[in-house]
Structures are given as C-alpha cells and as structure tokens.
Amino acid sequence: MSKKVINVVLKENIQKLGKSNDVIKVASGYARNFLIPNKMAAVATNGILKQQKFYAAIREEKLKTAKENAKKVKQLLEEIQRFSVSKKTGDGHNIFGSVTEKEISQIIKNTTNIDIEKQSISLPDVKTIGIYDVEIKLLHQVTANIKLQVLPESN
C-alpha cells in the first residue's frame, strides 16, 4: 500500500520541511491532521500557486531594490573609509569605557545621514586609542568595511 501525498504551501518556516511559501509534498494524513489545522500550511491549489508566483515576483523586486540601495550605501561608507571618535583617556593609551555599536551608528548618521542599525555593526573590543576595522552588514550578502579611529579627547 503506497502513501498518498499531496502538495501543500507552507505558511511558516518548519524545520526539516522547508521555508515559508515553499511548495512541498507531504503525506495527506500529515497535512490533514497536523499542518492544515495548525495553520502551518494550505493545500496547493491552482489559485494559491498563481498567488505564490505573484508574491514571489514582488519579493524578488523588493530584494533587488534593497540590494541596490545597500550597494550604494556600501560605496558611500567605503569612500569615506575612516570615521573618528574622541574619548577620554587614562594613563597610557587606555580609554575610559569603550566604543559601542550605538556610538558608531550615531557617528555614521551624523556624518552621512544614513541610519545603520547597531545590530548590523561588528567591531572588536575598543579599549585603547588606535585604528580599528569595523564590519557593517548592510544586507545578507552586502557588507561594508570601514576604519574607526579612536582619538584622545582634548581638554
């Protein structure tokens, strides 16, 4: 006796099955008794498949636009290349506190008028005066690399 399988469209990401909006084949009992009642999937009818294609085209266009914008921002940030911040220093080259992602985000906003989320900024521990490499993840595949120069604050 063979299993009956049906095509369903996933409404959310399900581990080991697929991502949201994927069309997959599952056992009809699994679909009827679990996926569909829990609103995790819908039966893949012709209307739903057309709707999927339409929304996929819209998502693709939005992604393309976002990627172009991210590349423009990357080019702008890498043209500037170095951002500076002044911090109070103690003995030697040690600074009081450290430089945070929020501060870098604010410096970039003040300089270029571009909002960068602090979660997308990756930097090493900044505890001394010097130049540091900072990586900014603008999009899944687009990252900008800038230099952060930490200077002693003049009294």
From Swiss-Prot:
What Pfam families does this protein's entry cite? Ribosomal_L9_C (PF03948), Ribosomal_L9_N (PF01281)
* Annotated compartments: Plastid, Chloroplast
Q: Which GO terms describe its biological process?
A: translation
Instruction: Report the InterPro entries cross-referenced here.
Output: Ribosomal_bL9, Ribosomal_bL9/RNase_H1_N, Ribosomal_bL9_bac/chp, Ribosomal_bL9_C, Ribosomal_bL9_C_sf, Ribosomal_bL9_N, Ribosomal_bL9_N_sf
**Chief location bin:** plastid
Xref: PANTHER family: 50S RIBOSOMAL PROTEIN L9 (PTHR21368)
Which family is this protein grouped under? Belongs to the bacterial ribosomal protein bL9 family.
Protein name, please? Large ribosomal subunit protein bL9c
Source organism of the structure: Pyropia yezoensis (Susabi-nori)
User: What lineage, starting at the top, does this entry show?
Assistant: Eukaryota, Rhodophyta, Bangiophyceae, Bangiales, Bangiaceae
